[in-house]
Curated annotation (Swiss-Prot):
One of its GO terms (biological process) is translation. SUPFAM superfamilies: Ribosomal protein S2. HAMAP family: Ribosomal_uS2_B. GO terms for cellular component: cytosolic small ribosomal subunit. Belongs to the universal ribosomal protein uS2 family. It comes from Trichormus variabilis (strain ATCC 29413 / PCC 7937). The keyword Ribonucleoprotein applies. This is Small ribosomal subunit protein uS2.
Length: 265
């Protein structure tokens, strides 16, 4: 029995790709046809690759491997955080900071700083400081929690990285390649399947599609670690984001925590 059925994928809109003019020819083997100027993904292949990805993730989890989920587009952010937490994995869902993996030693110092500030906040130590100093430290804490909260318990680079939208997360892909970290990734019709280890052709813009695919991958990790799955949950929190979000060519990443002016932009 397949991990995900064709009916489930159809209902979630997994088969809808991008406009034909925006495609990557390397995705041609995974495209079934085009309708009204939009590519339609071959769900038979998606189902097969989902089985492969599920079995791989479950096997890695059984061996005690660590996983990092990456998805910074707004449709994916909430799903990434909740599913990663559900299966006991790490995640990045705001911005990929340059050197997140390749310069892990430096990033870890910021993670340690986050933990230190959290301890000081919880103990009430910040309340004993002058108001201006305490305010500055709380602002720093909020930024660190926003960008590094999902990897707070990560002690070393992950063994496997799961990505939503390979094209958008190209910096993460490059760092994984440099470190030979396996990549399991959702790929829309504008992506490059050659740069990932297990491609999952799927609509990476629609909330329901992301929820279905990422949820199944989280299931695989949970099953590998615990031997069985919990009752499937519904995630109503993501209904506020639009499914027709377009990829923003101007997205960028920094190797430092963004300052207030950058966040305002």
């Amino acid at each position: 029995m397949p991990v995900v059925s064709l009916a489930q994928m159809m209902e979630s809109g997994v088969h809808f790709g991008h406009q034909t003019r925006r495609w990557n020819p390397k995705m041609s083997p995974y495209i079934y046809t085009s309708r009204n100027g939009v590519h339609i993904i071959d769900l038979v292949q998606t189902a097969h690759l989902m089985d492969e990805a599920y079995n791989y993730m479950r096997s890695q989890a059984e061996q005690g491997k660590k996983f990092l989920f990456v998805g910074t587009k707004r449709q994916a952010a909430g799903i990434i955080a909740q599913e990663a937490a559900r299966c006991g994995s790490h995640y990045i869902n705001q911005r990929w900071l340059g050197g997140m993996l390749t310069n892990w030693a430096t990033i870890k110092t910021r993670v340690d700083r986050l933990k230190d500030l959290e301890r000081r906040e919880e103990s009430g130590a910040l309340d004993l400081l002058p108001k201006k100093e305490a305010s500055m430290l709380r602002r720093e804490l909020a930024k660190l929690q926003k960008y590094l909260g999902g990897i707070k318990t990560m002690r070393k680079v992950p063994d496997v990285v799961v990505i939503v939208d390979q094209r958008r997360e190209y910096n993460a892909v490059q760092e994984c390649q440099k470190l030979s970290i396996p990549i399991v990734s959702m790929l829309d019709t504008n992506c490059d399947p050659d740069v990932v280890d297990i491609p999952i052709p799927a609509n990476d813009d629609a909330i329901r599609s992301i929820k279905l695919i990422v949820g199944k991958l989280a299931d695989a990790i949970y099953e590998g670690r615990h031997g069985q799955l919990d009752v499937e949950e519904e995630y109503e929190d993501y209904e506020g984001a639009e499914d027709d979000y377009e990829y923003d060519e101007t997205e960028y990443t920094d190797s430092v925590i963004p300052d207030d002016e950058e966040e305002a932009e």
